[in-house]
Amino acid sequence: MQVITSKDNELIKSIKKLKEKKYRDAYNKYIIEGIKIVGEAIQEKADIEYVVICEDCMNENIFDKKLMYEIAKLNCIYVTSKVFASITDVSNPQGILAVIKRAEKSQKINYKEDVIIVLDGIQDPGNLGTILRTVDSANLKQIVISNDTADAFNSKVVRSTMGAIFRINIIKSDDLIKDLINMKKNGFKIVVTALDTNDSVYDIDYMKKVIVIGNEANGVSQEVQEIADNKVKIPMLGKTESLNASVAAGIMIYEYVRLKLGGVSGDGAFWQPIFCQ
């Protein structure tokens, strides 16, 4: 087993480059790190270019035997703890990461889904990752993100998704208003959160809706608000006026899930339960 001992190794330097968005975009690759997400990548049949393993961590037997059996089938690179420390973004690394080639997924919006989630300027990687995880938990297969939303393949985003990133088609919109208008032409209505409304998130039927989640500081952009069909707010019992973007997204997505399972919406619409296969 050959072990890389130098941080100046060309392969190690190429991995370090993937910490920057411009190189992730140029090479169409990104990094995942940690035992669980590497296992998820294998399970989801992600295109793993190679796995990097810290020699010392392997000697400590912290890896599951079944995982090591699967990893052994891949292109594995072994490095010293010093070299691994130079490429990790985690304060307490588990000693394993992988370089993933981005899947060649369609950038066309699928209008067959009940609900489309759109992100309008989400900046925090943790929020973006949590929203992707929530979208996956609702069995939604796509998300549309504006140009000014954080990079979905940022390492913090990827960690926050807990593997959901392998199951969701992330569609980057170069012209969000144009894409939203096309969604309306395909029978969808646009729902945004706003403070200047008396309508609650619990008052509407979520079938064939586009749920737009806005920027953490400024909310949904004015241009998007102007073409919205429904403005809603999340009822607050305390003095707080707004919620974290990922929390707000979770509340709205799970109101859709509740209705999907046979609940009644505030407008009186009753949904027959439709269980996803």
Segments predicted by a language model, with ranges:
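Post-transcriptional modification and biogenesis factors for structured RNAs
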Residues: M1-Q277
